[in-house]
From Swiss-Prot:
Binds 23S rRNA and is also seen to make contacts with the A and possibly P site tRNAs. GO terms for cellular component: cytosolic large ribosomal subunit. Part of the 50S ribosomal subunit. PROSITE patterns: RIBOSOMAL_L16_1, RIBOSOMAL_L16_2. This is Large ribosomal subunit protein uL16. It comes from the Bacteria. The gene is rplP. GO terms for molecular function: rRNA binding; structural constituent of ribosome; tRNA binding. PANTHER family: 50S/60S RIBOSOMAL PROTEIN L16 (PTHR12220), LARGE RIBOSOMAL SUBUNIT PROTEIN UL16M (PTHR12220:SF13). Keywords: Ribonucleoprotein, Ribosomal protein, RNA-binding, rRNA-binding, tRNA-binding. It comes from Deinococcus geothermalis (strain DSM 11300 / CIP 105573 / AG-3a).
Amino acid sequence: MLLPKRTKYRKQFRGRMTGDTKGGDYVAFGDYGLVALEPAWIKSNQIEACRIVMSRHFRRGGKIYIRIFPDKPVTKKPAETRMGKGKGAVEYWVSVVKPGRVMFEVSGVTEEQAREAFRLAGHKLPIQTKMVKREVYDEAQ
């Protein structure tokens, strides 16, 4: 599973997920991308589940690019613990995903293969997603 090697601070505030994504809103590396349509915290194990299901669908061919990284720690206090005594221990890591963010990209596969792989990966995620193609801009314009 993905997590940072080290961070400046062990724990973070929760923050807010308002507005659209600030960056990462276009297909940069592959031919097709999976875009988030809703805001959410995507856990590191959900990212890994998507990677596994897509790589199994492609078998040998195709390259998968993971465009999100879980860099936010989420803490949790133990069950049946009284309030107080500080913030809980880090339970898991999440990536803050806002609408319009390209989460995964694939290359070296057909459009049908990419569509099916993204459909399977979308079932592993807690948000609505859609597939987008890479936009090729003409240099003459």
